[in-house]
Swiss-Prot record:
Residues 1-26, 77-100, 156-197, 260-272 are extracellular. InterPro entries: GPCR_Rhodpsn, GPCR_Rhodpsn_7TM, Olfact_rcpt. It comes from the Eukaryota. It comes from Mus musculus. Belongs to the G-protein coupled receptor 1 family. The gene is Or5b21. Glycans are attached at residue 6. GO terms for molecular function: G protein-coupled receptor activity; olfactory receptor activity. This is Olfactory receptor 5B21.
Length: 319
């Protein structure tokens, strides 16, 4: 029997998680369970608010509702398994389960890149061409941008999933991470990963820098338009409509670039884990807060919904 015949392909993986310290398992369980529940309530609530208030049926909120759905999607691809592993101690994930988690996480995360770019284009149209806004951001344009975002996202996920899971995993099946992400999976492969790493660098690089370029160009023209406004009130209003989006963009792209586009020799897996926690579970929780805390229209719509179900309590509390 040859040595090649003795090689056994991996049929399941073990997710090592954030830490193996038993004293930290319960605190981490409570923290991530809380974060995930806030994510579900925040993003689910944002979608309900937008769909239930006709005043929010505008391009900006159409994109925002899709962003909430996407945040739910890629957070749900990771958080439930992580919480279950912390609760039960069972860190095993099947090969197919790992591939599915990988596919949906990469897909939804890439969709978010393109949605953020679409939202920047929408803000550019609103600030730079307000008189033509309704003819620029039509229902058809918004639909095309959204469908294009999902298409690019899951096309990207298909490329990475096919490229990663064609590799041979015949050695250790212990993934030094809390979910099936690209870097730790490539580290486990027993076949050459040179081509796969090039695919990651160039495909992720294209998606990130193309969408980031759209955002930068949009905000360059937005900045010029704001500087040319004579009214300080107009400047303040224009800036406030963009501030939330800029905050979300900065946090999201900062962590994505740190994770996937720096030289592999310049990062440790533990550092990767910390960054991964941020963009897999923290950012989806923060986005609805970022977009709602300074948004009067969302707050007003929320009060209307609460007043509809609890008229006595909330009519008094608003006075």
């Amino acid at each position: 029997m040859t040595s090649m015949e003795n090689i056994t392909e991996v049929t399941e993986f073990i997710l090592l998680g954030l830490t193996d310290d038993p004293n930290l398992q319960v605190p981490l369980l409570l923290i991530f369970l809380f974060i995930y529940l806030v994510t579900l309530i925040g993003n689910g609530g944002m979608m309900v608010i937008i769909f239930s208030d006709s005043h929010l049926h505008t391009p900006m909120y159409f994109f925002l509702s899709n962003l909430s759905f996407v945040d739910l999607g890629y957070s749900s691809a990771v958080a439930p398994k992580m919480v279950a592993a912390l609760q039960s101690g069972n860190k095993v994930i099947s090969y197919n389960g790992c591939a599915a988690q990988f596919f949906f996480f990469v897909g939804f995360a890439t969709v978010e890149c393109y949605l953020l770019a679409s939202m920047a284009y929408d803000r550019h149209a609103a600030v730079c061409r307000p008189l033509h806004y309704t003819t620029t951001m039509t229902t058809g344009v918004c639909t095309i941008l959204t469908i294009g975002s999902y298409t690019c996202g899951f096309l990207n996920a298909s490329i990475h999933a096919a490229d990663t899971f064609k590799l041979s995993f015949c050695g250790s099946n212990k993934i030094n991470h809390f979910f099936c992400d690209i870097p730790p999976l490539l580290a486990l492969a027993c076949s050459s990963t040179h081509i796969s790493k090039l695919v990651v660098f160039f495909v992720v690089g294209f998606n990130v820098f193309f969408t980031l370029l759209v955002i930068i160009i949009s905000y360059f023209f937005i900045y010029i338009a704001i500087q040319n406004m004579k009214s300080s009130e107009g400047r303040k209003k224009a800036f406030s409509t963009c501030a939330s989006h800029l905050t979300a963009v900065s946090i999201f792209y900062g962590t994505i670039i740190f994770m996937y586009l720096q030289p592999s020799s310049g990062q440790s897996m533990d550092t990767d884990k910390i960054a991964s926690v941020f963009y897999t579970v923290v950012i989806p929780m923060l986005n609805p807060l970022i977009y709602s805390l300074r948004n009067r229209e969302v707050k007003s719509a929320l009060w209307k919904i609460l007043n509809r179900f609890y008229p006595a309590s909330f009519s008094v509390s608003r006075k």
